[in-house]
Amino acid sequence: MPEKATLSLGNASFRPGSSVAYVPVTLDRPTPNTVIARIITVNGSGTYRALSGYNYQTVDTVVIFRPGDPLIQTVAVPIIAATEGQQFQLKLREAPWGGLQGQSTATITASSAVEATLKATGTFREPRTFAATGTLQFELRKDTHKRSPDGGWDRWATSLANGRTQVANGETGLYLDSSIFPGIEGPVYWGTDGLVLHTQKLKTPISYGGQTWYYGSSALDGRNFLATQIGYGQYEWEAKMPNRRGSWPAFWLVSTSGWPPEIDIYEGFGYQSFWDFDRHVAHTIHVGANSTRYDARGVTIQTQQAYGLSGYSQGFHRFAVDIQRDYITWFVDGVETYQSVNPFQGFRFYPIMDVAVKTNGTYDDGSGDMTVKSFKIYSAP
Protein backbone atom coordinates (compact mmCIF):
# COMPACT_ATOMS: atom_id res chain seq x y z
CA MET A 1 0.00 0.00 0.00
CA PRO A 2 1.22 3.56 -0.69
CA GLU A 3 2.18 5.64 2.32
CA LYS A 4 -0.57 7.46 4.19
CA ALA A 5 -0.80 11.22 3.73
CA THR A 6 -0.14 13.49 6.72
CA LEU A 7 -2.76 16.18 7.37
CA SER A 8 -1.78 19.49 8.96
CA LEU A 9 -3.43 22.77 9.89
CA GLY A 10 -1.56 25.94 8.94
CA ASN A 11 -1.37 29.30 10.71
CA ALA A 12 -3.33 32.07 9.01
CA SER A 13 -3.82 35.84 8.98
CA PHE A 14 -6.73 38.09 8.11
CA ARG A 15 -7.10 41.86 7.91
CA PRO A 16 -8.90 43.70 10.73
CA GLY A 17 -12.33 44.56 9.40
CA SER A 18 -12.54 41.44 7.24
CA SER A 19 -15.69 39.33 7.36
CA VAL A 20 -13.93 35.98 6.96
CA ALA A 21 -10.62 34.28 7.74
CA TYR A 22 -9.31 31.40 5.63
CA VAL A 23 -7.28 28.68 7.35
CA PRO A 24 -5.26 26.17 5.28
CA VAL A 25 -5.64 22.41 5.74
CA THR A 26 -2.98 20.50 3.83
CA LEU A 27 -1.80 17.02 2.91
CA ASP A 28 1.90 16.35 2.46
CA ARG A 29 1.35 13.98 -0.49
CA PRO A 30 -1.41 12.64 -2.73
CA THR A 31 -3.56 10.39 -0.59
CA PRO A 32 -4.23 6.74 -1.54
CA ASN A 33 -7.49 6.83 0.43
CA THR A 34 -10.09 9.21 1.78
CA VAL A 35 -8.89 11.40 4.65
CA ILE A 36 -11.44 13.02 6.96
CA ALA A 37 -10.66 15.66 9.59
CA ARG A 38 -13.03 17.10 12.18
CA ILE A 39 -12.02 20.68 12.93
CA ILE A 40 -13.20 23.17 15.57
CA THR A 41 -12.42 26.75 16.60
CA VAL A 42 -10.94 27.52 20.02
CA ASN A 43 -10.80 30.89 21.78
CA GLY A 44 -7.50 32.73 21.84
CA SER A 45 -5.42 33.36 24.94
CA GLY A 46 -3.68 36.29 26.58
CA THR A 47 -4.26 40.02 26.12
CA TYR A 48 -5.19 39.77 22.44
CA ARG A 49 -7.47 36.76 22.66
CA ALA A 50 -10.41 36.63 20.26
CA LEU A 51 -13.62 35.12 21.61
CA SER A 52 -16.34 33.11 19.92
CA GLY A 53 -19.57 35.05 19.60
CA TYR A 54 -17.81 38.40 19.98
CA ASN A 55 -14.95 38.36 17.51
CA TYR A 56 -15.64 35.28 15.37
CA GLN A 57 -18.34 32.68 14.87
CA THR A 58 -17.78 29.15 16.14
CA VAL A 59 -16.87 26.62 13.47
CA ASP A 60 -17.29 22.87 13.92
CA THR A 61 -16.80 21.30 10.53
CA VAL A 62 -15.45 18.37 8.53
CA VAL A 63 -12.80 18.54 5.80
CA ILE A 64 -12.61 15.63 3.35
CA PHE A 65 -9.80 14.81 0.92
CA ARG A 66 -10.45 12.08 -1.64
CA PRO A 67 -7.90 10.35 -3.88
CA GLY A 68 -6.96 12.71 -6.70
CA ASP A 69 -7.92 15.88 -4.83
CA PRO A 70 -5.60 18.93 -4.58
CA LEU A 71 -3.40 18.94 -1.48
CA ILE A 72 -4.78 22.09 0.14
CA GLN A 73 -8.22 23.20 1.27
CA THR A 74 -9.24 26.14 3.42
CA VAL A 75 -11.70 26.40 6.27
CA ALA A 76 -13.67 29.65 6.28
CA VAL A 77 -14.24 31.22 9.71
CA PRO A 78 -16.78 34.08 9.80
CA ILE A 79 -15.36 37.16 11.55
CA ILE A 80 -17.68 39.38 13.59
CA ALA A 81 -15.22 42.08 14.69
CA ALA A 82 -11.50 41.83 15.33
CA THR A 83 -8.80 44.38 16.03
CA GLU A 84 -5.09 44.32 15.26
CA GLY A 85 -3.32 41.43 16.93
CA GLN A 86 -6.35 39.51 18.14
CA GLN A 87 -5.98 35.78 17.69
CA PHE A 88 -7.83 32.49 18.09
CA GLN A 89 -7.14 28.89 17.09
CA LEU A 90 -8.34 26.09 14.89
CA LYS A 91 -7.64 22.53 16.04
CA LEU A 92 -8.28 18.91 15.14
CA ARG A 93 -10.82 17.15 17.34
CA GLU A 94 -8.74 13.98 17.00
CA ALA A 95 -6.22 12.45 14.61
CA PRO A 96 -7.59 12.56 11.05
CA TRP A 97 -9.51 9.50 9.93
CA GLY A 98 -7.57 7.77 7.15
CA GLY A 99 -4.40 9.84 7.48
CA LEU A 100 -1.52 10.70 9.78
CA GLN A 101 -1.57 13.74 12.05
CA GLY A 102 0.81 16.61 11.44
CA GLN A 103 0.31 20.08 12.95
CA SER A 104 -2.94 19.75 14.88
CA THR A 105 -3.43 23.38 15.97
CA ALA A 106 -3.28 26.59 13.94
CA THR A 107 -3.26 30.20 15.15
CA ILE A 108 -5.35 32.74 13.25
CA THR A 109 -4.33 36.37 13.74
CA ALA A 110 -5.82 39.73 12.74
CA SER A 111 -2.94 41.64 11.14
CA SER A 112 -2.53 44.51 8.70
CA ALA A 113 1.24 43.91 8.51
CA VAL A 114 1.12 40.66 6.51
CA GLU A 115 -0.83 39.42 3.55
CA ALA A 116 -4.15 37.81 4.39
CA THR A 117 -4.31 34.05 3.84
CA LEU A 118 -6.20 33.40 0.62
CA LYS A 119 -8.97 30.94 -0.04
CA ALA A 120 -7.65 27.78 -1.68
CA THR A 121 -8.67 27.12 -5.24
CA GLY A 122 -8.79 23.83 -7.07
CA THR A 123 -11.18 21.21 -8.32
CA PHE A 124 -12.27 18.70 -5.72
CA ARG A 125 -14.10 15.56 -6.73
CA GLU A 126 -17.73 15.31 -5.69
CA PRO A 127 -18.64 12.13 -3.77
CA ARG A 128 -19.91 9.31 -5.93
CA THR A 129 -23.46 8.02 -5.77
CA PHE A 130 -23.80 4.25 -5.62
CA ALA A 131 -24.85 2.62 -8.85
CA ALA A 132 -25.01 -1.08 -9.65
CA THR A 133 -22.98 -1.19 -12.85
CA GLY A 134 -22.43 -4.94 -12.91
CA THR A 135 -24.77 -7.80 -13.80
CA LEU A 136 -27.03 -9.06 -11.02
CA GLN A 137 -25.47 -12.38 -9.96
CA PHE A 138 -27.14 -13.08 -6.63
CA GLU A 139 -30.12 -11.86 -4.62
CA LEU A 140 -31.06 -12.97 -1.12
CA ARG A 141 -34.55 -14.51 -1.27
CA LYS A 142 -36.56 -16.46 1.26
CA ASP A 143 -37.79 -19.01 -1.28
CA THR A 144 -34.26 -19.98 -2.38
CA HIS A 145 -32.35 -19.44 0.87
CA LYS A 146 -30.36 -22.45 2.10
CA ARG A 147 -27.81 -22.87 4.86
CA SER A 148 -25.96 -25.68 6.64
CA PRO A 149 -23.16 -25.95 9.20
CA ASP A 150 -20.36 -25.84 6.61
CA GLY A 151 -22.26 -24.53 3.60
CA GLY A 152 -22.02 -25.76 0.03
CA TRP A 153 -21.97 -24.63 -3.57
CA ASP A 154 -25.61 -23.48 -3.30
CA ARG A 155 -25.88 -22.49 0.37
CA TRP A 156 -24.46 -20.44 3.22
CA ALA A 157 -22.35 -21.81 6.05
CA THR A 158 -23.30 -20.94 9.64
CA SER A 159 -19.65 -21.23 10.66
CA LEU A 160 -16.59 -19.23 9.70
CA ALA A 161 -13.63 -20.65 7.78
CA ASN A 162 -11.71 -21.29 11.01
CA GLY A 163 -14.67 -22.71 12.90
CA ARG A 164 -17.30 -21.58 15.38
CA THR A 165 -15.08 -19.59 17.71
CA GLN A 166 -12.90 -16.50 17.33
CA VAL A 167 -10.89 -16.58 20.54
CA ALA A 168 -8.01 -14.60 19.03
CA ASN A 169 -10.41 -11.66 18.56
CA GLY A 170 -11.48 -11.81 22.19
CA GLU A 171 -14.96 -12.92 21.15
CA THR A 172 -17.06 -14.54 23.87
CA GLY A 173 -19.81 -15.83 21.58
CA LEU A 174 -20.08 -19.25 19.96
CA TYR A 175 -21.36 -19.20 16.36
CA LEU A 176 -24.54 -21.24 16.61
CA ASP A 177 -26.51 -23.56 14.35
CA SER A 178 -29.80 -25.06 15.55
CA SER A 179 -29.01 -28.37 13.86
CA ILE A 180 -25.87 -28.75 16.00
CA PHE A 181 -27.10 -27.17 19.23
CA PRO A 182 -30.80 -28.09 19.60
CA GLY A 183 -32.90 -26.18 22.10
CA ILE A 184 -31.27 -22.79 21.58
CA GLU A 185 -33.04 -19.70 20.29
CA GLY A 186 -32.76 -19.77 16.51
CA PRO A 187 -29.60 -17.89 15.46
CA VAL A 188 -30.83 -17.32 11.88
CA TYR A 189 -34.48 -17.08 10.85
CA TRP A 190 -36.81 -15.22 8.52
CA GLY A 191 -38.79 -12.52 10.29
CA THR A 192 -41.44 -10.08 9.12
CA ASP A 193 -38.88 -7.59 7.77
CA GLY A 194 -36.19 -9.94 6.48
CA LEU A 195 -33.50 -12.40 7.48
CA VAL A 196 -32.60 -12.07 11.16
CA LEU A 197 -29.14 -12.84 12.57
CA HIS A 198 -29.90 -13.31 16.26
CA THR A 199 -27.44 -13.15 19.15
CA GLN A 200 -28.16 -14.16 22.73
CA LYS A 201 -26.99 -14.83 26.23
CA LEU A 202 -27.52 -18.57 26.44
CA LYS A 203 -30.08 -19.83 28.94
CA THR A 204 -27.96 -22.97 29.27
CA PRO A 205 -24.20 -22.64 28.68
CA ILE A 206 -22.69 -24.83 25.95
CA SER A 207 -19.45 -26.81 26.24
CA TYR A 208 -17.59 -26.68 22.95
CA GLY A 209 -13.94 -26.98 21.99
CA GLY A 210 -12.84 -27.47 25.58
CA GLN A 211 -14.49 -24.25 26.73
CA THR A 212 -17.83 -23.19 28.22
CA TRP A 213 -19.74 -20.64 26.18
CA TYR A 214 -22.33 -18.30 27.68
CA TYR A 215 -23.21 -16.29 24.58
CA GLY A 216 -24.39 -17.12 21.08
CA SER A 217 -23.24 -15.37 17.90
CA SER A 218 -24.67 -15.66 14.40
CA ALA A 219 -23.07 -15.81 10.94
CA LEU A 220 -23.72 -16.58 7.30
CA ASP A 221 -20.51 -17.30 5.39
CA GLY A 222 -20.25 -17.70 1.61
CA ARG A 223 -16.86 -19.43 1.37
CA ASN A 224 -18.39 -22.42 -0.46
CA PHE A 225 -21.39 -20.60 -1.97
CA LEU A 226 -20.30 -20.03 -5.57
CA ALA A 227 -23.05 -17.59 -6.58
CA THR A 228 -21.92 -15.10 -3.92
CA GLN A 229 -18.30 -14.87 -5.12
CA ILE A 230 -16.97 -12.16 -7.45
CA GLY A 231 -13.69 -10.44 -8.28
CA TYR A 232 -14.96 -7.04 -9.42
CA GLY A 233 -18.41 -5.55 -9.00
CA GLN A 234 -20.69 -4.47 -6.20
CA TYR A 235 -22.11 -5.89 -2.98
CA GLU A 236 -25.08 -4.10 -1.41
CA TRP A 237 -26.92 -4.90 1.82
CA GLU A 238 -30.01 -3.19 3.22
CA ALA A 239 -30.13 -3.85 6.94
CA LYS A 240 -31.06 -2.70 10.41
CA MET A 241 -28.23 -2.94 12.91
CA PRO A 242 -28.23 -4.10 16.55
CA ASN A 243 -27.67 -1.61 19.36
CA ARG A 244 -26.81 -3.95 22.23
CA ARG A 245 -23.54 -3.17 24.01
CA GLY A 246 -21.16 -6.04 23.31
CA SER A 247 -22.56 -6.85 19.86
CA TRP A 248 -20.16 -6.68 16.91
CA PRO A 249 -22.07 -6.65 13.60
CA ALA A 250 -20.28 -6.72 10.25
CA PHE A 251 -20.56 -7.15 6.51
CA TRP A 252 -17.20 -8.23 5.14
CA LEU A 253 -15.43 -9.96 2.28
CA VAL A 254 -12.60 -12.50 2.40
CA SER A 255 -10.48 -13.77 -0.48
CA THR A 256 -11.46 -17.18 -1.83
CA SER A 257 -7.74 -18.04 -1.71
CA GLY A 258 -7.58 -17.44 2.04
CA TRP A 259 -7.31 -14.65 4.61
CA PRO A 260 -6.14 -11.97 4.13
CA PRO A 261 -7.14 -10.03 1.95
CA GLU A 262 -10.25 -8.76 3.72
CA ILE A 263 -12.59 -5.88 2.92
CA ASP A 264 -14.83 -4.67 5.76
CA ILE A 265 -17.84 -3.01 4.18
CA TYR A 266 -19.52 -2.21 7.49
CA GLU A 267 -18.25 -2.97 10.97
CA GLY A 268 -19.85 -1.92 14.25
CA PHE A 269 -17.58 -2.05 17.30
CA GLY A 270 -20.39 -2.32 19.82
CA TYR A 271 -18.06 -3.73 22.47
CA GLN A 272 -16.30 -0.35 22.63
CA SER A 273 -17.82 2.19 25.02
CA PHE A 274 -17.40 5.07 22.55
CA TRP A 275 -19.30 3.33 19.76
CA ASP A 276 -22.53 5.04 18.70
CA PHE A 277 -24.64 2.43 16.90
CA ASP A 278 -26.66 5.11 15.11
CA ARG A 279 -23.85 7.44 13.99
CA HIS A 280 -20.66 5.41 13.61
CA VAL A 281 -19.55 3.16 10.76
CA ALA A 282 -16.15 1.58 10.09
CA HIS A 283 -14.63 0.67 6.72
CA THR A 284 -11.30 -1.21 6.54
CA ILE A 285 -9.08 -3.25 4.24
CA HIS A 286 -6.67 -5.86 5.61
CA VAL A 287 -3.59 -6.54 3.49
CA GLY A 288 -1.40 -9.63 3.73
CA ALA A 289 -1.13 -13.29 2.76
CA ASN A 290 -0.95 -16.79 4.20
CA SER A 291 -2.90 -15.93 7.37
CA THR A 292 -0.58 -13.00 8.12
CA ARG A 293 -1.82 -9.40 8.06
CA TYR A 294 0.85 -6.76 7.57
CA ASP A 295 -1.30 -3.69 7.07
CA ALA A 296 -4.83 -2.50 7.83
CA ARG A 297 -6.18 0.72 6.38
CA GLY A 298 -9.52 2.21 7.20
CA VAL A 299 -11.65 4.68 9.10
CA THR A 300 -14.23 4.95 11.82
CA ILE A 301 -16.56 7.74 10.74
CA GLN A 302 -19.13 9.76 12.67
CA THR A 303 -21.37 9.83 9.63
CA GLN A 304 -23.96 12.26 10.95
CA GLN A 305 -21.40 15.06 11.06
CA ALA A 306 -19.45 13.98 7.98
CA TYR A 307 -22.36 13.10 5.67
CA GLY A 308 -25.66 13.76 7.46
CA LEU A 309 -26.33 10.00 7.80
CA SER A 310 -27.53 8.28 10.99
CA GLY A 311 -30.10 5.98 12.58
CA TYR A 312 -28.55 2.60 11.70
CA SER A 313 -30.24 0.74 14.56
CA GLN A 314 -33.53 2.61 14.17
CA GLY A 315 -34.39 1.62 10.62
CA PHE A 316 -33.09 0.08 7.42
CA HIS A 317 -30.05 1.53 5.67
CA ARG A 318 -27.97 0.50 2.66
CA PHE A 319 -24.30 -0.48 2.97
CA ALA A 320 -22.40 -1.13 -0.25
CA VAL A 321 -18.97 -1.48 -1.79
CA ASP A 322 -17.83 -1.11 -5.39
CA ILE A 323 -14.66 -3.07 -6.22
CA GLN A 324 -12.94 -1.81 -9.35
CA ARG A 325 -9.44 -2.48 -10.60
CA ASP A 326 -8.10 0.89 -9.48
CA TYR A 327 -10.23 1.76 -6.44
CA ILE A 328 -12.51 0.27 -3.80
CA THR A 329 -15.33 2.63 -2.84
CA TRP A 330 -17.70 2.36 0.15
CA PHE A 331 -21.23 3.76 0.33
CA VAL A 332 -23.90 4.27 2.97
CA ASP A 333 -27.42 5.00 1.73
CA GLY A 334 -25.97 5.59 -1.72
CA VAL A 335 -23.47 8.23 -0.55
CA GLU A 336 -19.73 7.65 -0.98
CA THR A 337 -18.21 7.54 2.50
CA TYR A 338 -14.69 6.20 1.80
CA GLN A 339 -12.39 5.23 -1.05
CA SER A 340 -9.05 3.43 -1.23
CA VAL A 341 -6.67 2.32 -3.94
CA ASN A 342 -7.26 -1.36 -4.63
CA PRO A 343 -4.27 -3.51 -3.61
CA PHE A 344 -6.19 -6.70 -4.41
CA GLN A 345 -6.23 -6.90 -8.22
CA GLY A 346 -6.95 -10.42 -9.41
CA PHE A 347 -8.49 -11.69 -6.16
CA ARG A 348 -11.99 -13.11 -5.80
CA PHE A 349 -14.04 -12.58 -2.67
CA TYR A 350 -16.84 -14.23 -0.76
CA PRO A 351 -19.18 -12.40 1.64
CA ILE A 352 -19.82 -12.84 5.35
CA MET A 353 -22.61 -11.27 7.36
CA ASP A 354 -22.40 -11.80 11.08
CA VAL A 355 -23.06 -10.49 14.55
CA ALA A 356 -20.30 -11.49 16.94
CA VAL A 357 -20.47 -11.12 20.72
CA LYS A 358 -17.64 -9.65 22.76
CA THR A 359 -18.72 -9.09 26.35
CA ASN A 360 -18.84 -10.73 29.76
CA GLY A 361 -21.83 -8.67 30.87
CA THR A 362 -25.57 -9.23 31.08
CA TYR A 363 -26.00 -8.69 27.33
CA ASP A 364 -29.66 -7.75 27.64
CA ASP A 365 -29.98 -4.08 26.66
CA GLY A 366 -31.55 -3.03 23.37
CA SER A 367 -31.42 -5.50 20.49
CA GLY A 368 -28.61 -7.89 19.62
CA ASP A 369 -30.09 -8.71 16.22
CA MET A 370 -29.25 -7.66 12.68
CA THR A 371 -32.12 -7.80 10.19
CA VAL A 372 -31.21 -8.02 6.50
CA LYS A 373 -34.01 -6.85 4.22
CA SER A 374 -32.04 -7.11 0.99
CA PHE A 375 -28.67 -8.35 -0.25
CA LYS A 376 -27.57 -8.19 -3.88
CA ILE A 377 -24.34 -8.96 -5.70
CA TYR A 378 -23.43 -7.53 -9.10
CA SER A 379 -20.49 -8.96 -11.04
CA ALA A 380 -18.34 -6.93 -13.42
CA PRO A 381 -15.63 -8.04 -15.85
Give residue ranges: language-model regions.
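Short boundary segments that mark the start of a structured unit
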Residues: 1-119
